[in-house]
Amino acid sequence: MPRRRVIGQRKILPDPKFGSELLAKFVNILMVDGKKSTAESIAYSALETLAQRSGKSELEAFEVALENVRPTVEVKSRRVGGSTYQVPVEVRPVRRNALAMRWIVEAARKRGDKSMALRLANELSDAADNKGTAVKKREDVHRMAEANKAFAHYRW
């Protein structure tokens, strides 16, 4: 623990096309080897495809997909007297977004479609329809938290 003041989280610049900080964060998570312009072009073309499929604006469709993947509870390991318990804890709003975006990108990378933009568009549209690998991941996390509800009193 730091003995001096706690440094706050840095603000990131909103993305140039839509002016959204959430989308800028998503592009940063999508980025590989510091190639931001490549990540931006992949994200924008995926959002364009998603908007055409859903009939909503790009940001609206992205927000819906993200909302369906955001976890509300997760489990954290807590060691008590020689045994480790999986303790369910509520997820902070910033971490909710980070986890949802990370899961969507991971699921898109595992898909077998041709281009990354298409994989990402398919994963986002699946997430918007409440199906797909990223939504399944959220369901698994919620199921783990539900199964370990008995250890909720070990929260710290």
UniProtKB/Swiss-Prot annotation:
A GO cellular-component term linked to this record: small ribosomal subunit
Family matches, as Gene3D superfamilies: Ribosomal protein S7 domain (1.10.455.10)
Record keyword Ribosomal protein present: yes
Sample GO molecular function, one term: tRNA binding
Keyword entries, A-Z: Ribonucleoprotein, Ribosomal protein, RNA-binding, rRNA-binding, tRNA-binding
Signal peptide: none
GO BP: translation
Domain of life of the source: Bacteria
The UniProt record lists the keyword RNA-binding: yes
InterPro entries: Ribosomal_uS7, Ribosomal_uS7_bac/org-type, Ribosomal_uS7_dom, Ribosomal_uS7_dom_sf
Function, in words: One of the primary rRNA binding proteins, it binds directly to 16S rRNA where it nucleates assembly of the head domain of the 30S subunit. Is located at the subunit interface close to the decoding center, probably blocks exit of the E-site tRNA.
Family under the similarity heading: Belongs to the universal ribosomal protein uS7 family.
Subunit and partners: Part of the 30S ribosomal subunit. Contacts proteins S9 and S11.
Protein known as: Small ribosomal subunit protein uS7
Gene: rpsG
